């Protein structure tokens, strides 16, 4: 049985499709559609009608893909842009009625907690998982039997627009200083994947990371596109994302970072997988 998930993010909309069985979930394919909902949200306070129409068109296209592949069930979640927009409920209802499918707007802390579904997160006491999106940064870490989770209004698009607040940087610093020093950061999101891939490595130590970040910041948007084959909506925000990762590395004392292909859409699909197949379990009490 095929299932899918859709993540309506601040910089783009992403979907992933999976084949499943009672004990297996296997990735098949993905789609990404740049839309940058966060630009109007962070500057004007709400998502305009033309952007909602674009979003509807993207989601209808995804539905057609699902139908052609015989996807049985799927879930749609929206993150920071929908959390922050003044017309959140109105926008959600408009989208739901247009595509005839529910959308769930998840909180920053729920988004952070979803990282526990990453295959490497179970019983992992050494790594810090950092999901850096267009509008916010989520952190997940295990400390003994407790979970350390945080959500901060610092993101690649938000910071590019100069809408990040000093108080949020201070709050992030307090969080990092409060919790234990991780041995490694697992970076989630397209910016950190693109940055590490551009350096032709699988992981980087702090010194190499900071030097490479400085080198990339010296390049123009056009140079980033030419040298690394970045898309325009990656080239203009990647420096702002890497600045946040650099801050997290330095303030946490972490000396190593790697990226992962995992994202919100993967976690949502795994969550849906468990919900579907748990219904087939007979419970006796």
Label each region the model flagged.
Residues 23-28, 146-148:
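Beta-strand initiation motifs
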Residues 3-7, 127-131:
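Short glycine-aspartate micro-motif
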Residues 12-14:
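Short N-terminal binding/cap micro-motifs at the start of the first secondary-structure element
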Residues 135-141:
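Acidic, divalent-metal-coordinating active-site segment for phosphoryl/phosphodiester hydrolysis
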Residues 76:
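Dinucleotide-binding Rossmann-like beta1-alpha1 core, especially the glycine-rich loop
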Residues 4, 17-20:
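Active-site neighborhood of HAD-like aspartate-dependent phosphohydrolases
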Residues 34-35:
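Short, glycine-rich, amphipathic interfacial segments at transmembrane boundaries or analogous
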Residues 17, 40-71, 79-117, 121-126, ...:
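Helical "lid/coupling" subdomains associated with nucleotide-phosphate turnover
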């Amino acid at each position: 049985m095929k299932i899918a998930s859709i993540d309506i993010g601040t910089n783009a909309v992403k979907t992933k499709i999976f084949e499943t069985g009672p004990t297996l979930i296997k990735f098949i394919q993905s789609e990404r559609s740049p839309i940058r909902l966060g630009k109007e949200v962070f500057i004007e306070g709400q998502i305009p009608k033309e952007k909602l129409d674009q979003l509807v068109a993207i989601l209808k296209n995804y539905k057609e893909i699902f139908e052609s592949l015989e996807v049985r069930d799927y879930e749609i979640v929206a993150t920071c842009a929908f959390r922050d927009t003044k017309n959140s409920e109105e926008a959600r209802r408009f989208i739901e009625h247009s595509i005839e499918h529910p959308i769930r707007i998840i909180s920053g802390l729920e988004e952070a907690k979803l990282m526990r579904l990453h295959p490497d997160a179970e019983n992992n006491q050494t790594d810090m998982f950092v999901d850096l999106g267009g509008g916010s940064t989520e952190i997940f870490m295990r400390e003994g039997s407790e979970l350390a989770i945080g959500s901060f209004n610092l993101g690649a698009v938000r910071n590019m627009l100069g809408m990040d607040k000093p108080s949020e940087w201070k709050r992030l610093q307090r969080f990092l200083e409060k919790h234990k020093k991780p041995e490694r950061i697992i970076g989630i999101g397209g910016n950190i994947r693109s940055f590490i891939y551009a350096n032709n490595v699988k992981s980087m130590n702090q010194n190499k990371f900071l030097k490479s970040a400085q080198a990339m910041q010296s390049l123009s948007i056009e140079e980033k596109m030419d040298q690394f084959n970045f898309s325009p909506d990656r080239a203009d925000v990647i420096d702002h994302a890497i600045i946040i990762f650099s801050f997290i590395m330095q303030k946490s004392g972490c000396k190593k970072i790697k990226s992962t292909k995992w994202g919100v859409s993967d976690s949502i699909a795994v969550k849906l997988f468990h919900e579907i197949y748990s219904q087939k379990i007979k419970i006796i009490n």
